[in-house]
Amino acid sequence: MRRTVPRGTLRKIIKKHKPHLRLAANTDLLVHLSFLLFLHRLAEEARTNAFENKSKIIKPEHTIAAAKVILKKSRG
């Protein structure tokens, strides 16, 4: 099984940024899952950008451009 961020550490980080929120027992797992899904979408978009630019390597420019697109879509 893959190692993840310690749950207690993730809960402390969330509480530090939003101390007034009451968190459910599985909130840290949902945040971690959202993070992994974001990374997956970012990697796919960066790969597409690299392919469109006829590059075999994903460069920082591809990742930055992908991040802008993904974050714009995520704002909802």
Curated annotation (Swiss-Prot):
Recorded GO MF terms: DNA binding; protein heterodimerization activity
Record flagged with keyword Thylakoid: no
Main subcellular location of this protein, as a coarse class: nucleus
GO cellular component: kinetochore; nucleoplasm
One Pfam family recorded for the sequence: CENP-W
Stated family: Belongs to the CENP-W/WIP1 family.
Subunit: Heterodimer with CENPT; this dimer coassembles with CENPS-CENPX heterodimers at centromeres to form the tetrameric CENP-T-W-S-X complex, which is a subcomplex of the large constitutive centromere-associated network (CCAN, also known as the interphase centromere complex or ICEN). Interacts with NPM1.
The protein, known as: Centromere protein W
